[in-house]
């Protein structure tokens, strides 16, 4: 019984975590409407993953693992991680690349400003 509960908890946690991850199959649909912020990263760089995404408003936020989606890495020319791309109605509007230390130089305020400019564009 203890093993069953442990497995159920692990499955539930994994499902919740996976909801914000994109793969090629669901990528296009997820970026089609409104402002979407997508972080491209790799398992070896998870320590430098963008952590303040919950502070962003007026946008959807997703993650793409480049190891699991090499075709997206190629299509969007992701050469360093992390890379954040802001889409507006399916089109690339802004791109922020990780530096030589595999860290993002963009601040949450800068990301929010870019999101707000695109979001307000609909009015």
Predicted features and spans:
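N-terminal leader/targeting and pre-domain segments
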Residues: 17-33, 110-123
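Non-catalytic, surface beta->alpha helical segment in thiol-disulfide oxidoreductase systems
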Residues: 86-123
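Active-site regions of enzymes building and remodeling cell-envelope glycoconjugates
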Residues: 56-64
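Local sequence-structure signature of Cys/Sec-based thiol-disulfide redox active-site neighborhoods
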Residues: 21-57
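Extracytoplasmic/secreted cell-surface and envelope-processing proteins
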Residues: 46-49, 72, 94-96
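Structural micro-motif
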Residues: 76-88
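Sec-dependent N-terminal signal peptides
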Residues: 4-13
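N-terminal post-signal-peptidase region of extra-cytosolic proteins
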Residues: 66-71
């Amino acid at each position: 019984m203890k093993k069953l509960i442990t497995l159920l908890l692990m499955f539930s946690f994994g499902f919740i975590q996976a909801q914000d991850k994109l793969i090629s199959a669901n990528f296009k649909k997820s970026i089609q409407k409104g402002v979407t912020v997508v972080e491209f990263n790799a398992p070896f760089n998870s320590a430098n993953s963008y952590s303040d995404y919950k502070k962003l408003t007026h946008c959807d936020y997703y993650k793409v693992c480049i190891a699991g989606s090499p075709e997206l890495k190629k299509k969007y020319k992701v050469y360093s991680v992390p890379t954040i791309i802001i889409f507006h109605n399916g089109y690339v509007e802004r791109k922020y690349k990780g530096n030589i230390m595999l860290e993002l130089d963009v601040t949450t305020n800068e990301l929010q400003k870019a999101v707000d400019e695109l979001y307000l564009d609909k009015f």
